[in-house]
Structures are given as C-alpha cells and as structure tokens.
C-alpha cells in the first residue's frame, strides 16, 4: 500500500527495487549443451536484471529518485553475481566487520581460522581506538573549557559556612543501681552430691568389651560367612 503523500508509481518502483535486493538473483549462467535445457541463444539473452533495469529507466525517467533506484539495482546485481577473489582482496576491508569464517578476515593461519579472526578483531579494535582518541580528546578539552569557568564562578559565589563546632561530649553514664537481691555474695559453684560421671579409662573400656561370664561369644549363624556344605540331614545343613 502506498504511503500518504507518495505517488503509486514511486512506491511501485521502490517495491521492485526492494524485491531485487531481497531475492538477490543475478544473470543465469550458461548451463552448457543440454538436451532439454535452454540453448546457447537463450543463455545469451538479456537476464532478469537487465530487463528490470530497463523497466526502471522507462518508468522512472522523469523522477528525482532515478539515480538512487538505479544504484540499488546495480548494487543488487553486483551482490547476486558475486565478486571474484581478486576483487575481494583488492577492496578495502572494513576494520569492524571481521568475524570468524569471513573472507574479509584474511586467509586462515596454520593454527586455525579462529586465531586469524581474533587477531583481525584485535587489530580492528586498536584501529578504532586510535581513530576515537582524537575525538575524545577534543570532547574533553571542550568540556573542560566550558566547565572550568563555571566551577570558578561557583567557588567564588558559594556562601561562607560557619566554623564547625566541636563535637558534643558524651553524656555521663548513670550510676549503677544497688542489688535488690540478697546482699551476701553468691557462693562459688560446687558439683551436686552423688556419684560423679567421669570419662572411662582404657582399662574400663577393655573390661567393658570382655565377654560377660555365663554368656557365649558365638555370633549368630546368619552373620557367619558362607560354609561348605557336605550334605543335608533332616532339612539342616551339615558342615564338611
């Protein structure tokens, strides 16, 4: 739909140019001798880009945006046809447009393309920092020139503050209240009467681990390891 205040013909021309940029299809290459394919004469015929260029020139010959539209179409044709390796090497490389796997980052080194791309990024960053430094210095100088007079004026016109008074002395602590309980001092702690629980000695531990008289030290049969069974008598196993 055309924008308000814009002729429909201009919108149509711009739409066609944007379609060319979006699709990115250029002149078809020569398919070679084929039985059912197009022949040599069809391959030499003007391609789609040439026909579109002619239509744009014919439709927008009297409008002011003709050079811009033609430039868009030429750019689309160049991007669709693709540039050769020599053209890519000859064109100036954008310092901030390098990334891994891009032909603009240069040929990969023996250690891998990632190392080459990271080196290109570092060089691009240094170049950008060098280009930013003069502008930053100029901005700092202009800011200093505009700010320093204002600071001096404010320093001269600021009101005189009274001298700082000394810090107040802390309030005296209240006197300790007399004890309201019994006046006699508390007796020192003494252990309660009765047998005292002291830690067991090594001898007591040894006596505790010895078997008590009248009891067997034989462990439960279920806790014994596997034994060799020679036979079964009456449902009970007999050791060999």
From Swiss-Prot:
Compositional bias (Basic and acidic residues): 19-31, 60-74
Biased composition (Low complexity): 176-187
Chain positions covered by the region annotation Disordered: 1-117, 161-240
Comp. bias regions, Pro residues: 165-175
Entry superkingdom: Eukaryota
Family: Belongs to the FAM246 family.
Protein name: Protein FAM246C
UniProt organism field: Homo sapiens
């Amino acid at each position: 739909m055309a924008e308000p205040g814009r002729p429909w013909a201009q919108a149509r021309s711009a739409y066609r140019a944007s379609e060319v940029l979006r699709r990115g299809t250029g002149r078809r290459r020569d398919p070679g001798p084929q039985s059912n394919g197009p022949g040599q004469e069809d391959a030499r015929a003007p391609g789609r880009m040439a026909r579109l260029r002619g239509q744009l020139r014919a439709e927008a010959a009297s409008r002011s945006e003709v050079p811009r539209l033609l430039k868009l179409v030429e750019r689309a044709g160049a991007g669709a046809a693709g540039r050769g390796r020599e053209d890519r090497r000859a064109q100036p490389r954008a310092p901030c447009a390098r990334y891994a796997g891009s032909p603009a980052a240069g040929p990969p080194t023996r250690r891998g393309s990632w190392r080459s791309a990271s080196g290109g990024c570092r060089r691009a960053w240094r170049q950008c920092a060098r280009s930013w430094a003069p502008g930053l210095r100029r901005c700092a100088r202009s800011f200093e020139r505009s700010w320093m007079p204002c600071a001096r004026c404010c320093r001269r016109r600021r009101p005189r503050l009274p001298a700082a008074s000394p810090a107040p002395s802390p309030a005296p602590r209240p006197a300790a209240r007399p004890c309201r309980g019994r006046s006699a001092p508390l007796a020192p702690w003494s252990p309660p009467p009765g047998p005292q629980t002291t830690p067991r000695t090594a001898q007591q531990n040894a006596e505790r681990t010895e078997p008590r008289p009248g009891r067997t030290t034989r462990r439960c049969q279920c806790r014994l390891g596997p034994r060799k069974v020679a036979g079964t008598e009456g449902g009970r196993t007999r050791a060999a």
